[in-house]
Amino acid sequence: MKYNNILKGKFILRPNRFIAYVEIDGNEEVCHVKNTGRCKELLIPNATVFIQKNDNPKRKTKFSLIGVVKGDRMINMDSQVTNKVVHEWILKGNLLKDVTLIKPEAKYKNSRFDFYVETKHKKIFIEVKGVTLENNGIVKFPDAPTERGVKHLRELIDCIKEGYDAYVIFVIQMKEVVHFEPNVETHKEFGDTLKYAKENGVNIVAVDCLVDEDSINIRDYVDVIL
């Protein structure tokens, strides 16, 4: 996945979930933050950030914050990009073989999953979660309580009971981490439900990514510790 019109900046302040003030070429600019998570460990004053410039006159802001440098790590913060990189990854023959159909935003009962996939022998629902929280190489999800995430896991279990295969894919938006684990300190119910989902047949997958200031692509599988 490739971005265009990327600029380098310096983070100043995030007054709410949706915008941040960033210094770009000596000027203070308002940027849309493409991640509504807390990201407090990433967006600290003077952090180096990467911004995508958008020339669409209908947008309220012409800049979007997509990446940040934490120590020696480049971390992609774009929560909208994870589905795109998973789609590309599956199309290249990863995760599943003999894929005959990939349908994004697939409806299941009264909800939607990120993907519905068919192979020659299986019908599969997939939910994707982006991961940006890292400490000493250990990455965790979520960075804030997520009732929606718990709901998705329970619905994936329902899919299994109805004869589908089911996956939750944690896309770690950085490279070379130690392992992934649920953030039970922040949301114990999510961690418990994730473990229960695995026990009931849901496939739990974590992958890291090669991240540059203007690109992100899935690199390899990462160990999952529940």
UniProtKB/Swiss-Prot annotation:
GO molecular function: DNA binding
InterPro entries: SfsA (IPR005224), SfsA_C (IPR040452), SfsA_N (IPR041465)
Pfam families: SfsA, SfsA_N
Superkingdom classification of source: Bacteria
Record-linked CDD domains: SfsA-like_bacterial (cd22359)
PANTHER family listed in its UniProt record: SUGAR FERMENTATION STIMULATION PROTEIN A
NCBIfam families, per database record: sfsA (TIGR00230)
Similarity remark: Belongs to the SfsA family.
Protein name: Sugar fermentation stimulation protein homolog
Organismal lineage: Bacteria, Bacillati, Bacillota, Clostridia, Eubacteriales
